């Protein structure tokens, strides 16, 4: 009830302004009695994945809390994990505004944010300040002005700095809003990146006495052959998980709607079937050797179960959370429990 009132108010605002307002509000109330307006008591439905035990299978996807400012608030809502970021080595403003658009009739969002964030050092300070026992994944990327062929260095810098504070690390090479980034999903560039990250993981495990799993986040706009090659590289480099999928450049299901022709990645309900197809193809290629977190267009509990049936072990929500509110978390967990 409270969320529907808040949503009505925020949907009158510019999308990015509304997002910033929400983050500011959650940041200030996450550990105060005021979190009673959104906190939910949810019966555990544990999932073991990547050698970690999560309290339930529903996580917050990266992009909502880029700088890790509201981890305790999202944990209070009942998320089984919170993925913060995407974070880059240096702060960057992202792309020019406007860069975030609602397509309300389709329950969709288009964004071309461009990894706007305060930098990895700021994120680390926020991770240190977390008071709850939230499972936090950190999604890492490269700075826009770092050449693609040197992008590996940015990922290694971020990994080094967040390692001891993260439950797991997600490697984002699939955002459509950083020029050239998606080229890292292919061939020698992918193998070199994954191999270097795996070696870094081994070094940091020895240094900190703690094994932090690493996952790769992929795009939905891939051919069957490309998915097969990515799966092969994940297996050969012994990655701990895959996250499927990021936003899409396609516009299926939104043609003719206001803002549908804006540049950027499409998320929300129209992405659901495409991301589920990719999850199924990826799962078939991985043959149970590497687990999958399914994300993309989940708007109902049934959507989440479809992704689990397709081969995902856990799911994440973002756009569906914007449109449906915290109740979606509870709905998915309850459906998962009785499945």
Swiss-Prot record:
Alphabetical UniProt keywords: Cell membrane, Flavoprotein, FMN, Membrane, Oxidoreductase, Pyrimidine biosynthesis
Keyword ATP-binding: no
Gene3D superfamilies noted in UniProt: Aldolase class I
Protein name, entry field: Dihydroorotate dehydrogenase (quinone)
UniProt main location, coarse: membrane
GO biological process, one term: 'de novo' UMP biosynthetic process
Subunit details: Monomer.
Pfam families noted in UniProt: DHO_dh (PF01180)
Catalytic reactions of this protein: (S)-dihydroorotate + a quinone = orotate + a quinol
Membrane topology label: Peripheral membrane protein
Subcellular location: Cell membrane
MF terms (GO), sorted A to Z: dihydroorotate dehydrogenase (quinone) activity
Pathway: Pyrimidine metabolism; UMP biosynthesis via de novo pathway; orotate from (S)-dihydroorotate (quinone route): step 1/1
NCBIfam families per the UniProt record, alphabetical: PRK05286.1-1, PRK05286.1-2, PRK05286.1-4, PRK05286.2-5, pyrD_sub2
EC number: 1.3.5.2
Family that this chain belongs to: Belongs to the dihydroorotate dehydrogenase family. Type 2 subfamily.
Cofactor binding notes: Binds 1 FMN per subunit.
Listed InterPro entries: Aldolase_TIM, DHO_dehydrogenase, Dihydroorotate_DH_1_2, Dihydroorotate_DH_2, Dihydroorotate_DH_cat, Dihydroorotate_DH_CS
Lineage: Bacteria, Pseudomonadati, Pseudomonadota, Gammaproteobacteria, Alteromonadales
Binding positions (FMN): 62-66, 86, 139, 172, 217, 245, 268, 297, 318-319
């Amino acid at each position: 009830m409270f969320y529907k009132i808040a949503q009505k108010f925020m949907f009158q605002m510019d999308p990015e302004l509304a997002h910033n307002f929400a983050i500011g509000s959650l940041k200030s109330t996450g550990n105060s009695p005021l979190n009673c307006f959104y906190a939910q008591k949810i019966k555990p439905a544990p999932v073991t994945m990547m050698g970690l035990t999560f309290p339930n299978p529903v996580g917050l996807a990266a992009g909502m809390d880029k700088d890790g400012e509201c981890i305790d608030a999202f944990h209070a809502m009942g998320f089984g994990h919170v993925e913060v970021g995407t974070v880059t080595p240096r702060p960057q403003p992202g792309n020019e505004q406007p860069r975030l658009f609602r397509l309300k009739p389709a329950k969709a969002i288009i964004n071309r944010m461009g990894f706007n964030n305060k930098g990895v050092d700021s994120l680390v300070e926020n991770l240190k300040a977390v008071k709850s026992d939230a499972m936090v994944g950190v999604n890492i990327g490269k700075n826009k002005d770092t050449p693609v062929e040197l992008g590996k260095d940015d990922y290694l810098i971020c990994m080094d700095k967040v390692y001891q504070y993260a439950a797991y690390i997600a490697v984002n090479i699939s955002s459509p809003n950083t020029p050239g980034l998606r080229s890292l999903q292919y061939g020698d560039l992918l193998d070199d990146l994954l191999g270097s990250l795996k070696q870094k993981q081994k070094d940091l495990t020895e240094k900190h006495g703690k094994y932090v799993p690493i996952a790769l986040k992929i795009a939905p706009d891939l051919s069957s052959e490309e998915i097969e090659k990515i799966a092969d590289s994940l297996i050969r480099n012994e990655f701990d998980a895959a996250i499927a999928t990021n936003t899409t450049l396609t516009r299926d299901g939104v043609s003719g709607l206001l803002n549908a022709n804006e540049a950027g990645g499409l998320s929300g309900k129209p992405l659901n079937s495409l991301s589920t197809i990719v999850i199924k193809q990826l799962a078939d290629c991985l043959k149970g050797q590497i687990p999958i977190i399914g994300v993309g267009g989940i708007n109902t509990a049934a959507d989440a179960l479809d992704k689990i049936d397709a081969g995902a072990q856990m799911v994440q929500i973002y756009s569906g959370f914007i449109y449906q509110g915290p109740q979606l978390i509870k709905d998915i967990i309850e459906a998962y429990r009785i499945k």
